[in-house]
UniProtKB/Swiss-Prot annotation:
Residue ranges that the UniProt entry lists as topological domain Cytoplasmic: 1-8, 89-93, 147-163, 237-244, 292-303
Organism domain of life: Bacteria
The name this protein goes by in its record: Heme A synthase
Chain ranges on the Extracellular side, renumbered to this chain: 30-67, 115-125, 185-215, 266-270
Lineage: Bacteria, Bacillati, Bacillota, Bacilli, Bacillales
Domain notes: The N-half (TM1-TM4) and C-half (TM5-TM8) domains are connected by an intracellular loop. Each domain is formed from four-helix bundles and they align in a pseudo twofold symmetry manner. The N-half domain is the substrate-heme O binding domain and the C-half domain is the cofactor heme B binding domain. The cysteines of disulfide bond Cys-37 and Cys-44 may be involved in transfer of reducing equivalents from quinol in the membrane to the active site of the enzyme.
Amino acid sequence: MFGKKNLKWLGVVATLMMTFVQLGGALVTKTGSADGCGSSWPLCHGALIPEFFPIDTIIELSHRAVSALSLLMVLWLVITAWKHIGYIKEIKPLSIISVGFLLLQALIGAAAVIWQQNDYVLALHFGISLISFSSVFLITLIIFSIDQKYEADELYIKKPLRRLTWLMAIIIYCGVYTGALVRHADASLAYGGWPLPFHDLVPHSEQDWVQLTHRIMAFIVFTIIMITYIHAVKNYPNNRTVHYGYTAAFILVILQVITGALSIMTNVNLIIALFHALFITYLFGMTTYFIMLMLRSVRSDKQ
């Protein structure tokens, strides 16, 4: 059960499960299904199996079930990884972070159901779950990198790219928070057309300000990632890990911008909105991978 041969498929399945947790949370918010089980948690309308199953109850129950299964899968993964590849420096802290933030995510979700938190607190939920996802994602990448197909262990990242990548990570996380706030504040269609309502640029409500703030953050995110991408491919042309990694990040942010624009143009089409959540999830995951490589470079400086 905890054999080393299970590591790769466990990593893939756990990463996919965490992806479904992210998408499930976005689906709950987008469809207004957060109250699908009333104010009961972990029960649903005070029962293990509710008497009626309207669509919002099905969505909320499904999200809870996937979250519970993902916790079990992540526990299985981290125990196996700790046992067999715990000698790799990042495995143990990533294991603790992945489980810890997954539990914290569940507690915040439960608090939101029971005590009805305000939008600014609820917006933290997606960001916290994103940290848990990224930790699982990194464990999986480490498992596959043991084969050293891309020689990532020998990669040395210089200070200019390190600074840009740290800035990129911080800006992305701020953008994630504002995006989650847009969903929770029901501001997806606020502040007129995209990219700006040129006929009336002045925000007139809190929702307008939330939406405008997110658009500004999205523009900053795109700009920083584009600058970082150009720097990376220009200065590391022969390193496949950097070249492919930052290229993938740039493609993901382009897709993120496109789906963000289409969400507004289509009056928040659900499929497009879920792709919007998917792209930012993997963009942040890629960014945390760059940070892990950077920290290895910092350690090599000290040796």
